[in-house]
């Protein structure tokens, strides 16, 4: 090959090498940009889910307040406390059945006296233990979540019952978790592989998953899984 041909081939090689380097740089830059965009999108989705879950939680609190503040309920409780007779108990049971159980998502309502002793209850959700009345200035208190074999995930709130400035007892309201499930099962923006996992700490290095998962065959409904499983792909 003469010198001109060699120079031409060298220039072509340099040009191809430059194009290759530019392509690699452009690919890496594009990949990083796509990754950054994906992370920002996921952050935005997570923030949106958190806001939706906060609204669900506030909805439970509002419903508890609505039930607690009912004038019929107050009259029924005062009548039962003053008379302790069966007629007053039946009346209070009817009031709770028609008002409290008529509120969407309510599974069980229990009324206790100032000593925490049950005086009336309606609903079919399991009893999880002694009812703890809020102390001090606390109004409505979230008491936690529980798994029931019959009802699935249940959410519990308690509140003191005050009539004319006097504490007459307390109320426990147990909700199903359907509203939470609706939020968690909305996979908009997550494609076919994305997953929404709502968890709360449990014991023995486990977490309680509060919603059903679409990619974990062993957990089609709320339940406990090891902590490390949350980070698995």
Residue ranges of predicted features:
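Short, conserved clusters of charged catalytic residues that mark active-site
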Residues: 8, 48, 91-95, 175, ...
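Extracytoplasmic/periplasmic ligand-binding sensor regions of membrane-associated signaling proteins
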Residues: 55, 93, 97-174
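A structure-centric signal for secondary-structure junctions around beta-strands
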Residues: 61, 106, 151-153, 167-168, ...
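Polar/charged, Q/E/K-enriched amphipathic alpha-helical segments with strong coiled-coil propensity
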Residues: 80-85, 91-92, 181, 223
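Intrinsic low-complexity, intrinsically disordered coil/linker regions enriched in small/polar
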Residues: 120-122, 164, 175-233
């Amino acid at each position: 090959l003469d010198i001109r041909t060699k120079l031409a081939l060298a220039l072509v090689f340099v040009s191809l090498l430059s194009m290759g380097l530019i392509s690699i740089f452009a690919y890496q830059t594009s990949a990083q940009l796509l990754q950054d965009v994906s992370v920002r999108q996921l952050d935005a989705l997570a923030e949106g889910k958190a806001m939706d879950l906060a609204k669900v939680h506030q909805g439970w609190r509002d419903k508890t307040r609505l039930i607690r503040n009912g004038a019929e309920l107050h009259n029924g409780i005062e009548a039962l406390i003053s008379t302790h007779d069966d007629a007053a108990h039946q009346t209070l049971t009817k009031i709770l059945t028609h008002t409290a159980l008529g509120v969407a998502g309510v599974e069980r309502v229990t009324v206790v006296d100032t000593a925490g002793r049950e005086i009336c209850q309606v609903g079919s959700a399991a009893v999880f233990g002694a009812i703890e009345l809020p102390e001090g200035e606390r109004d409505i208190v979230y008491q936690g979540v529980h798994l029931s074999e019959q009802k699935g995930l249940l959410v519990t709130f308690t509140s003191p019952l005050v009539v004319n400035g006097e504490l007459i007892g307390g109320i426990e309201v147990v909700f199903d978790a359907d509203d939470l499930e609706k939020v968690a099962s909305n996979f908009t923006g997550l494609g076919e592989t994305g997953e929404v996992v709502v968890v709360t700490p449990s014991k023995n290095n486990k977490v309680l998953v509060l919603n059903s998962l679409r990619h974990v065959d062993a957990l089609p409904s709320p339940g406990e899984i090891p902590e490390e499983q949350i980070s698995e792909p």
